Amino acid sequence: MPHISVMMYPGRDEATKELIAKNLQAELMRTMNAPANFFSVSIEEVAPEKWDETVAAKVAHDDLYITSDIVK
């Protein structure tokens, strides 16, 4: 509790993905005042041509707090 799921285009190396995960975890620790073992983070790479069917169609607009040019 909670789990953060990141979906993004391919191309980042493992070190960058690890840094993304650690930064997200650290911010949640700070914001929620909870220890690291409360949070899990996954990163899934999605090809641009599969983005709409894999990501955009699955995101519930009521759950979307920040939009982007790709997911609105």
PLM regions: where:
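A domain-level signal for the structural core that forms small-molecule/cofactor-binding pockets
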Residues: P2-K72
